[in-house]
């Protein structure tokens, strides 16, 4: 998805309202991807509320309900929760924690290197490669970024160099600044 994928507001190409059958399919996909979301899904996406897909540049689609940006994906890829949603429902993703030193890099969009996950202050929890995770930071209450495991937690510990987690969406990026879409 590359850096700065949500930089310009005018990159929204169109917005479509989804049919009930499509919404059902999306909800099933979300339940499959994020089993922990089940008790909250009807709260996040109430049955009566229209669900829209906002299409952006680079084939990015953002799922919105009542203007709230909930999930996004690229092409037919997996859905990722937005940080705003994650801050309300922090337990829908497994967590990984970086040390204090990694914070400024994560917030500038950098990928997370293995040493930032294995040093004192970091907490590395078991997770397989390709798992979507919430990146927490030492001393911070809320997730800083949504990432994807590029290596398993076990390999991150063993190898301890290179990119451990790809940074997909971080605080203060363009998607964060979109806030809502009416």
From Swiss-Prot:
Residues modified to Phosphothreonine: 82
Protein's cellular compartments: Cytoplasm
Phosphoserine modifications at: 119
Keywords assigned: Cell cycle, Cytoplasm, DNA damage, Growth regulation, Phosphoprotein, Transcription, Transcription regulation, Tumor suppressor
Record note on modification: Phosphorylation is critical for stabilization and promotion of cell proliferation.
Domain PUA intervals: 93-172
Superkingdom in the source lineage: Eukaryota
GO molecular function: ribosomal small subunit binding; RNA cap binding; translation factor activity, non-nucleic acid binding; translation initiation factor activity
InterPro entries xref list: MCT-1/Tma20 (IPR016437), Pre-PUA (IPR041366), PUA (IPR002478), PUA-like_sf (IPR015947), Uncharacterised_CHP00451 (IPR004521)
GO biological processes: DNA damage response; formation of translation preinitiation complex; IRES-dependent viral translational initiation; ribosome disassembly; translation reinitiation
Domain-level remarks: The PUA RNA-binding domain is critical for cap binding, but not sufficient for translation enhancer function. MCT1 N-terminal region is required to enhance translation possibly through interaction with other proteins.
Described purpose of this protein according to its UniProt entry: Translation regulator forming a complex with DENR to promote translation reinitiation. Translation reinitiation is the process where the small ribosomal subunit remains attached to the mRNA following termination of translation of a regulatory upstream ORF (uORF), and resume scanning on the same mRNA molecule to initiate translation of a downstream ORF, usually the main ORF (mORF). The MCTS1/DENR complex is pivotal to two linked mechanisms essential for translation reinitiation.
The family this protein is said to belong to: Belongs to the MCTS1 family.
Name the UniProt record assigns to this protein: Malignant T-cell-amplified sequence 1
Organism: Rattus norvegicus (Rat)
Chain's gene name: Mcts1
């Amino acid at each position: 998805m590359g850096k700065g994928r949500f930089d310009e507001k005018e990159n929204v190409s169109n917005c479509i309202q989804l049919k009930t059958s499509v919404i059902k399919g999306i909800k099933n996909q979300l339940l499959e991807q994020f089993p922990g979301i089940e008790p909250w899904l009807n709260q996040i996406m109430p049955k009566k509320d229209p669900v829209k897909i906002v299409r952006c540049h680079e084939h990015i689609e953002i799922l919105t309900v009542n203007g709230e940006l909930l999930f996004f994906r690229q092409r037919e890829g997996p859905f990722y929760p937005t940080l705003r949603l994650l801050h309300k429902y922090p337990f829908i993703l497994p967590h990984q924690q970086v040390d204090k030193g990694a914070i400024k890099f994560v917030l500038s969009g950098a990928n997370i290197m293995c040493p930032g996950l294995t040093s004192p202050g970091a907490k590395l929890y078991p997770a397989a490669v390709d798992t979507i995770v919430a990146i927490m930071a030492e001393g911070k209450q809320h997730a800083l970024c949504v990432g994807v495991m590029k290596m398993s937690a076990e390999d991150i510990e063993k190898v301890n160099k290179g990119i451990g987690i790809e940074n997909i969406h971080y605080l203060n990026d363009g998607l964060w600044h979109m806030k809502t879409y009416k």
